[in-house]
């Protein structure tokens, strides 16, 4: 897929460091015949290399926003631009390929295959992208070493702690060398010690590799570790602050 597709439009005045732009983005769901507006005219940029937290109470629209940023769902209104390209102009197949190439995901429930080892779980996205067995094994092994799980590559998820499972999930997200990693409540199922460990590990990967991280949280303690924090309330951005 070429992103020089003639149907793709490009917004003007995009700073060189801007990776993602949301322009008056809204998301509406139908509850029976009743429309529910989960997000209202969201407008903000995500810059390359940022470590950004979207925070707020349950029901504020955080997960809905992450699904839009991760290009899993399309906005009801507005436009999303990734590296200057309007994602709404891509076909479903083009969007799937683009998302697979550029975005990694970390889930609060880990989403690991229980019958596969840690190594096999990390190899999965590489196989999907057509990476051969030997190369996939080498890259997955290195990814697990990077998150401190070299001794557990053959362990299945049920033999790992919650923190270890989330480290496998981080390795799986990073093994495809994405430009953006989306993490929806990555510490929700972890205790305070493991929560800070996971955020510190994500931060380390962000700094070492220059990968952009966007994660959601309702835990204010984690906000001290970020470059920027965006408060979402009732589907609207209430505050957008850079940290010292």
Annotate each predicted stretch with a short phrase.
Residues 229-241:
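H-loop (His-switch) and adjacent beta-strand-loop-beta switch element
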Residues 1-28, 239-244:
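ABC-family P-loop ATPase nucleotide-binding domain
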Residues 19-225, 229-232:
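ABC family nucleotide-binding domain
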